[in-house]
Amino acid sequence: MTDSKYFTTTKKGEIFELKAELNSDKKEKKKEAVKKVIASMTVGKDVSALFPDVVNCMQTDNLELKKLVYLYLMNYAKSQPDMAIMAVNTFVKDCEDPNPLIRALAVRTMGCIRVDKITEYLCEPLRKCLKDEDPYVRKTAAVCVAKLHDINAQLVEDQGFLDTLKDLISDSNPMVVANAVAALSEIAESHPSSNLLDLNPQSINKLLTALNECTEWGQIFILDCLANYMPKDDREAQSICERVTPRLSHANSAVVLSAVKVLMKFMEMLSKDLDYYGTLLKKLAPPLVTLLSAEPELQYVALRNINLIVQKRPEILKHEMKVFFVKYNDPIYVKLEKLDIMIRLASQANIAQVLAELKEYATEVDVDFVRKAVRAIGRCAIKVEQSAERCVSTLLDLIQTKVNYVVQEAIVVIKDIFRKYPNKYESVIATLCENLDSLDEPEARAAMIWIVGEYAERIDNADELLESFLEGFHDESTQVQLQLLTAIVKLFLKKPTETQELVQQVLSLATQDSDNPDLRDRGYIYWRLLSTDPVAAKEVVLAEKPLISEETDLIEPTLLDELICYIGTLASVYHKPPSAFVEGGRGVVHKSLPPRTASSESAESPETAPTGAPPGEQPDVIPAQGDLLGDLLNLDLGPPVSGPPLATSSVQMGAVDLLGGGLDSLMGDEPEGIGGTNFVAPPTAAVPANLGAPIGSGLSDLFDLTSGVGTLSGSYVAPKAVWLPAMKAKGLEISGTFTRQVGSISMDLQLTNKALQVMTDFAIQFNRNSFGLAPAAPLQVHAPLSPNQTVEISLPLSTVGSVMKMEPLNNLQVAVKNNIDVFYFSTLYPLHILFVEDGKMDRQMFLATWKDIPNENEAQFQIRDCPLNAEAASSKLQSSNIFTVAKRNVEGQDMLYQSLKLTNGIWVLAELRIQPGNPSCTDLELSLKCRAPEVSQHVYQAYETILKN
């Protein structure tokens, strides 16, 4: 009979029966009882009451029974730490058992019991197992060191286990070497500064020797370790590559990806003139192609990694286009990834083949896939200039199918083709206009409106077409409204006499009838431009547009280099560095590729050159979307660096003159408009303050930076509060506050002894918390604390402790021990102690980031009864590391744009509105934007605390 019988029982009150069976003299009965206990535990029943009875069964020679008891022990040791100590003697005994399987089982279980109380008892058995004669025991003990380090790092260091682990790298058994490497890598990742894996050519040679003999998972550990090594020159890099290359033909896809990672990294150091370099490129293609014949889930992971490889080195797979053609039974997520890679590999040589495929895909039934295929045709046109005409012809064929969603996607991509190749394909506009009535998606409607506005002089009835859109203006999405506003202003500047009523109608709708601040602001800007200087308006609105970038979705080069170092990990699937998604960022190391050799740089061909050319050599193109995302993802690497001032063109200067601070003087002027129309400037009261200026448009100079920002005077410190009253702590009273001085966080404590006995042996510990706060040093009370004595201590804190989200976010649970007892209390720390000194963001970056953070992440607050002017507020906030990036005055209202950064790299952007010189209005308005919205409430509380004290 199978073991399934143990899971079918529904008896009640069986704990007593099991207890009796566990204490039976018969071995078989005991084993049956333990199996029943494990079955109950597996289905979620609480059998912790049987702990002492199960532990008694450990004293057995039966390996199966011992395994079951150890399984039970691992599960319940944490909830029964006092009882778990009972098992220590058996562990010690089992670690000396003649059977290596039992020795290994004992040491494995020891590592899985995460109970502080018993860790010190396990050191001696572990030390013996690390030097055991049997390699199976040694390899198990190596992993146990990493587990023990996670529970008590200091203990592991004090006991010298790390040195023993390093010695195991030279072990004669390859599996021991692999496990030692895995354990050291794990420890090194959680303590990046420890320099545990101090690799040198000798140790690398040992690892490469072990690589050929250990299991597939052992090979992965060793390859990942090799990827962290920096060869001293290109000869050593080539030697390592030669010995790693055979792993490319391994059956396990994880081994293949780890080998690819090592080769991609070390190829950076090889000269392109070398014959070996070309050979290596050829060897990399077949294993990557083979990965695409695996099951869909593996294919997806492989494709996400190939996407990175193709961006870094397209020459590897340039002849393998066919393997990325979509199969009818591929899941949608595989299809979309394949499409993306097809576009990246598209070139003049294979474009005919690619277009034929894409046209075929556009007739499929899967709507999402069809949309992506149509977009892909447009991207091919932009990437391969010689194919543009063929692509436009293909898109027109698809429009003739009259399939609604195909038509709409085609119009969206044709807009981009017009941008890339001006005055070349405008003959198709008539065909596009025929489909105007069928457009119901915002993006397609916006694209069509852009085309009509941009080429209004070529379309006879452009005013009628735009007027038809204007009829339902308030029902349109914001995207369409903004595009319609701009298109009608363009039309007016091209045909002023015929469209006066139309432009006044749209400006009125945008500025007076709309609640959307972006739309309102753009309406006011156009209105003022037209009413003040029509010539400048023409220069701004009808300015020559920059070229559209060939690859709008290439990953930014520095981010790409970092992601190449993470091939085969979750980061390579997300296309984000670990610091962007690992909670708290603890132990996250930023990796980068080795520097290129001089010969490899000089030999780089134009086709394969990476996209990050120096700024002086780049054409004036729209920055790739990936660039901005890359910058935002890497904001936590250090303070934003201000670049040199940008040279503004005459058009940009015009925008600044029109809009920068001199708005009041414009309000009364009503010069002659274009075509004799008098534009009345809009009412002053309704002018909103908004940051919606495009980056680099000159509108960013609306910010009027003042030199009167306050100087540093030390972060605000709250008065001490009683955290633990004497009546709850047997006479020990603890008061305290938190401070931040010159980048160091401290907990300032006041300990008072209100008991009748002397207090000694003080220690302190924090529970895991949202920002990893932990004591950076022991609690030093140098002399015994006598009755009625008070002592003040400043305890330095670090932010590298364990992270766990607390409720509320700034909750800190503390345990204080002395010779009397252990006492627990919780307190709320002010968030401003986590505001770091390099939290001032560059103005351009501020604008880009503000726009990039979704509007739903914005939070609005009011700070009541705070009669401060802008200078005083800015000075107070700067002393607590809230930095003023820019200041504006709009209609008598001071606007401070501010940035701050938390210790875990989260940026918070703020807009603070102040009414200066108005004693009746002392309320300040605060808008906060952040990628982690749950932080906003606590940042607001910090603002209120700092400004009111």
Swiss-Prot record:
Widely expressed. The modification N6-acetyllysine is found at K318. Residues 594-611 have a biased composition (Low complexity). GO terms for molecular function: clathrin binding; protein kinase binding. Residues 584-625 are annotated as: Disordered. It is a peripheral membrane protein. Signal peptide: none annotated. GO terms for cellular component: AP-1 adaptor complex; cytoplasmic vesicle membrane; cytosol; early endosome; Golgi apparatus; Golgi membrane; intracellular membrane-bounded organelle; lysosomal membrane. It comes from the Eukaryota. InterPro entries: AP_beta, AP_complex_bsu_1_2_4, ARM-like, ARM-type_fold, Armadillo, B-adaptin_app_sub_C, Clathrin/coatomer_adapt-like_N, Clathrin_a/b/g-adaptin_app_Ig. The modification 3'-nitrotyrosine is found at Y574. Keywords: Acetylation, Cytoplasmic vesicle, Deafness, Disease variant, Golgi apparatus, Ichthyosis, Membrane, Nitration, Protein transport, Transport. GO terms for biological process: basolateral protein secretion; determination of left/right symmetry; heart development; intracellular protein transport; kidney development; melanosome assembly; platelet dense granule organization; vesicle-mediated transport. It is found in: Golgi apparatus; Cytoplasmic vesicle, Clathrin-coated vesicle membrane. It is linked to Keratitis-ichthyosis-deafness syndrome, autosomal recessive: An autosomal recessive form of keratitis-ichthyosis-deafness syndrome, a disease characterized by the association of hyperkeratotic skin lesions with vascularizing keratitis and profound sensorineural hearing loss. KIDAR patients manifest ichthyosis, failure to thrive and developmental delay in childhood, thrombocytopenia, photophobia, and progressive hearing loss. Low plasma copper and ceruloplasmin levels have been reported in some patients. Belongs to the adaptor complexes large subunit family. Adaptor protein complex 1 (AP-1) is a heterotetramer composed of two large adaptins (gamma-type subunit AP1G1 and beta-type subunit AP1B1), a medium adaptin (mu-type subunit AP1M1 or AP1M2) and a small adaptin (sigma-type subunit AP1S1 or AP1S2 or AP1S3). Subunit of clathrin-associated adaptor protein complex 1 that plays a role in protein sorting in the late-Golgi/trans-Golgi network (TGN) and/or endosomes. The AP complexes mediate both the recruitment of clathrin to membranes and the recognition of sorting signals within the cytosolic tails of transmembrane cargo molecules. This is AP-1 complex subunit beta-1. It comes from Homo sapiens (Human). The gene is AP1B1.
